[in-house]
Amino acid sequence: MTRTDDTAAADQARFVAYCKQRKVNCMIVGLFNYLGDVKSSLPVPSYSCEHITRVDILSNGLVTLCCMDTEGKFGWGDASKESILDIYNGPRARAYRAMHRQGRRKQIPPCGTCNLFWPSFDGLSWPRRVQFGFAYAYYLLRYRPFIKHTASFPASSPSP
């Protein structure tokens, strides 16, 4: 569930109860600020994003930066014209991964405005993994951007 400013605590409780009833793990997250269009108090993390090691392909074949790039504005290539492996290892994809791994996420568009907080530790040296691990832990402790189904809801939550 994506929580917005007008999401009521009762709505979240009903969602949690609905998921528990069906024995499904759930997560409630805040709305991420991908292109700077969403009002959010969460800052852009300093560590690398999990999306830099994924491949997201739109229905038209465009390989995008991440799942948030639904129109392919930050595309890496076209899977209908070249292999996915070539695109993944291509210069644009490598440049994004390098910037993230160097701790320069905030300097590359659109990542510089995106506050998605899940990290990627792939391809990092051990010192950088430790550094980003501490940064991630601090981010979670300071901002607590998600609520797991076991947190802060009474067992007698109302049913949907």
Regions found by a protein language model. Name each.
Residues 8-9, 21, 127, 137:
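Short, structured coil/loop segments at alpha-helix boundaries
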Residues 49-52:
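Short, small/polar residue-rich loop motifs at catalytic or cofactor-binding pockets
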Residues 12:
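Histidine/acidic residue-rich metal-binding segments in metalloenzymes
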Residues 1-9:
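Conserved strand-turn element in the central/C-terminal portion of the radical SAM core barrel
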Residues 102-160:
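Radical SAM enzyme core and accessory elements
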Residues 57-58:
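Short, acidic, Ser/Thr-enriched surface-loop or helix-capping motifs
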Residues 16-40, 62, 68-121:
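C-terminal accessory region of radical SAM enzymes
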